[in-house]
C-alpha cells in the first residue's frame, strides 16, 4: 500500500506507480549524429566491421567493388551504390559466409590531371615535368580517396579500409602490365592507324565508355553537289536507254552532280571518295533549270523538300552501276572515284551517297582500305586543320572551320542547302566538350579476336535485371576494337620501346616481365624517371641507344577492367570469378565490359558469376541533379543536417540506408526532402515499435521468466507464426536482392501486425497485470523473441538501429553484437499456419468494429474504446469457427474476444439492444455498439458492474484490486 499515491486535489489514490510502465534507455529519437559514430566505434573495437565476415566458417562470398573515381565529393549515386553493396555484404556475413569486401578506387586519368593543372599558374605549368605532374596527381588522388573513404565509413559501410585497392598502387600497376602482356602474347594487342574518338579539349583518344551524348547538340548539316567529271560506259548506256535527251549531239552528258549530306562540313577537305550501296536503287533526277543530280531513289522526295528544289526522276539505276564515276572535288583541284561501300549506307537519312573521309570515320576508313585510298587526316591533336587542308590551315574544326568551308562551297556553286540539325553527338565525358573522329596511330585490343568467346561468356552469367544481358550482348557484338592508348601523362604506361631510326617495336615476354617486376617494387613513375638502359632487361642493355620509351598511357577502363586480375584472383578469401558485380547501368559499356573483355581474352570466362545493376539518383521531379538546377541532394546533409536544421534535419545514416532499401533501384530513383520525410516516418515507426518492445522487457530475463512456447496463448502463438512468416519473406527479399520488399514487409510488420494489432491488444496484459502474472510473462516471452528477430532482420539495412536495439535488450545475451548472432532462424515450434485463417477472420471483424468506434469518437459519443460495449450476431461460418477456436482458450485470460477488440464487454448473439450508438449489417455479421454499463476502473479503464469493496480502492475493479493489494 505504500506505493499508492494520492491525488492531492481529489484526495483519492492514483495508480500510475502500480502499472508496469515502459522503462528503456533506447530513445524515441535516434540522436544519430552522436549515436551512430559511437556504434561504429564499437564495431571497430570488437573487430566486427571487417573481421567478423573474414572469420566466418561458411563458403566464400565475393562482391567485387567497382572502383569509384578518386575525384570530387560523394553524391547520391555513390550512396545508392555503396549502401546496396553493404546491405548485401552484411546479409551474407550474417548468414555465416566468409565475406571480404575490398573497396577500390580508380586513380588515374585526365580529370585528376586537369585538377592538378588548374591549381597551378602559368609559370608553374611551364616548369612542370611529367614526373612532377604524376607526383602531384598521385597526392591529389590519395587525398580524395581518404575523404571519400571517411564518407563511406560514416554511411556504415564495412570493408577492408586498411587495405583498399588503388589503381595507382605498385602491385596493381604491375599486375596490370602482366595482364596487358598476356593479351599481347595471345595476339590480341596491336598498333595501327585508325580513326578513333578524339578529344581536342583533352588532346587524347577516347574509348566509347568515355563518351556521353548530351541532348541539344546542333550541327551545321549541308547538302553538297560534287560535279561528275567522267562516267563509266555502263552508266552511259543506261542513260541512253532511259533518257536519251540528256545526252547532247556530241554524245556527252549535261552537267551532273553527286549529292552528299554531312553534319561535319569541316571534313570536306579530307574527302577521298563517295561511297554508294550497290544494292540500293539510285536515280538521275532533273530540276526545272535542267540541272542533274544523282541520289537514292527512296530519298529523292525528302531531299527535294529539304533543299527546296523540285526534281523529276529521269533514270533509275542500281548502285553497282555508279561504280567507277570520277568526280571533281568542289574546293580543290582534285579528282576522286565513286566506290562501292557496304550495308552501312542506307536510306534512313542523307542521300544514299556517302562523303568518304577515311581519316574521320570508321566505315570511311574501312572502305578506303578496301580500295587502297589515301588516309587523309588534316587535323592536329588540338582540333586545328593542318597544311594538308590547304587554305583552311589553322581553322578550328569545332569552331570556325565549318562556316568558312560552307562559304567557299557557296562561292563554288556546290552548296545546295545548309540546315541546322539536332542529333546525338559524342562529347568528352570529362571536359564536357565535343569530340571528333581522327585517324592516329594507337594501340588497340583486338575484340574481333575473342568476340565470340565474350558473347559466349555473357550467356554463362546471371544478369539482373535480365535486360542487362541483351544490352551488353549487343554492345559487345557491335563494338569495334578497343583503343587502349591515351596521350596523357597520368596513367599506367604502355610498356613499349620504339626504334629511334627505324620502324621496329620492342614488346615481348622478356621486356614486359622485366617492367612488371620493376613496377611492383618502384611503381610506374620509373617509366618517366629511369633511362631506357635502366628499364630494359639485362639481355638488351647493349641496345639501349637503339630504343626510346613510348609516351602513351593506358585507357583508365583498362586499369579498372584489370582489377579482377590484381584483386580477386590474387588476394586470399576472395573468389574469381566474383560472386557479384554491382554497379550503375551505365557500366554495361564501362567497367562490366572492360572487365569481361580482359578476363575473356586471358582466361576465356567472365570475371563474375552474377551482375546486378541499378539506375541513377534523380530529384523528386525525375530530373538529373546538377548545380545549375540547384537540385543536388548531398548525402552528408542528409546525415548531419544542413545549416538550417528545420529545412534540412539531421536524419542520420540509417535513414539514408533505408531510402536505398525502399526504391526500385533497377530503374532511376527519386530523392528529395518530401521523400526523406516519408522515409524518416517509416524509420520512426520501426524505431518506436522496437522501443515499445524493449520498454516492456525491463524486468524480464528470458532464462528465468519465459513461458514455454507450447503453453503460450493462441494470440502469442499466432504472433510467433507471423514473425516466422516475416523472417521467411525478408530472407527471400535479401536473397533475391529485392530490398524494397524488405522495406514494405518490415514496415507492415511493425505497424500493422505489431503496433496496430498485437501490441494494441497486449497493452492491458503488459501494463495492468502483476509483474509475474502468466498474462504478462507470456507476452514478454513473445516480445523478447520478436525484438531479437527484428534486430537481426533490419541489421543489413538499419545497421545502427539494429545494434542499438541489441545493446538495449535488458537481459544477458551471449553475443555482444547482433551481427555476431547471425541471421535470424525460424524455429519449427513457431510455425503453425492453421492460425492464419481464424486470425484473419477475427481481424476482419475487428476492423469493422474499430471503424464503427472511430465513427462514435468523431461524433463525440465515445472517447476510449473501453467506454463501449459491443454485440455481434455472426452469420458467416468462417467467423463463427474463428470465435469458437478462440473461445477454447479463454481460460488463459488472454484469448478473450473483448480484449482482442479492446472493449469493456462483448456479447455474441442475443436480443438486439434498445439503445445503441451505431449499428451495421454486412455479409458476415451484424454489429451494435452501445455505451458500456457499470463504472470506470481508474487503473485499467475498463467499465465493470462490480468494483472493489475495499474502502480505500472503491474506484478500481476487482481484478486491479488483487494486483494492487499484492504489491
UniProtKB/Swiss-Prot annotation:
Q: Which GO terms describe its cellular component?
A: cytoplasm
Question: PROSITE patterns from the entry?
Answer: AA_TRNA_LIGASE_I
Q: Which InterPro entries match?
A: aa-tRNA-synth_I_CS (IPR001412), aa-tRNA-synth_Ia (IPR002300), Anticodon_Ile_BEm (IPR033708), Ile-tRNA-ligase (IPR002301), Ile-tRNA-ligase_type1 (IPR023585), Ile-tRNA_ligase (IPR050081), M/V/L/I-tRNA-synth_anticd-bd (IPR013155), Rossmann-like_a/b/a_fold (IPR014729)
Task: Provide the alphabetized UniProt keywords.
Answer: Aminoacyl-tRNA synthetase, ATP-binding, Cytoplasm, Ligase, Metal-binding, Nucleotide-binding, Protein biosynthesis, Zinc
Q: Which cofactor does it need?
A: Zn(2+)
Which NCBIfam families does the record cross-reference, listed alphabetically? ileS (TIGR00392)
Protein name, UniProt field: Isoleucine--tRNA ligase
